[in-house]
């Protein structure tokens, strides 16, 4: 894809993400597998522009939602994962699909070594919407730098 983003995102329930996922990234031994049934063929991710819509469509009002930030460069070059940009398919019969192409990961689970930042538990604002940190980087962090640079910690409401 031309102008591919440096990061891709996954919203997941806290139970899907080990508490030590950020620490385990240095070992290349633990991976994000996604949900059985939903992520059996590929793992669903979102771009920075799609995360808010994903949160509203599938996680509205939930208080145990984690944001995972994955570095595209590491997923492609070090984990050898295949990122395909495909149209959304409705999860339920009769449901309208979301617009645009979404990043789908083929080739196995995503090693936590591909994380660009520690997973974040998302808070809800007074309207019940998830509060997201600033998303999107110009350059993907390298694993040697630990993925901590480039994050100002700014928060945006969705």
Which residues fall in each region the model found?
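Conserved, structured core segments of small domains
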Residues: 2-158
């Amino acid at each position: 894809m031309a102008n591919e983003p440096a990061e891709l995102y996954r919203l997941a329930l806290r139970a899907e993400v080990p508490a030590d996922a950020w620490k385990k990234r240095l070992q290349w031994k633990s991976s994000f597998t996604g949900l059985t049934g939903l992520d059996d063929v590929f793992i669903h991710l979102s771009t920075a522009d799609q995360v808010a819509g994903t949160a509203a469509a599938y996680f509205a009002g939930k208080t145990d939602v984690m944001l995972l930030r994955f570095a595209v460069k590491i997923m492609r070059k070090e984990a050898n994962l295949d990122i395909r940009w495909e149209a959304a398919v409705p999860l339920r019969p009769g449901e309208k699909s979301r617009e645009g192409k979404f990043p789908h990961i083929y080739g196995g689970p995503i090693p936590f070594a591909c994380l660009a930042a520690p997973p974040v538990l998302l808070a809800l604002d007074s309207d019940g919407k998830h509060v997201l940190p600033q998303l999107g980087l110009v350059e993907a962090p390298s694993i040697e730098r630990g993925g901590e640079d480039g994050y100002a910690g700014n928060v945006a409401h969705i």
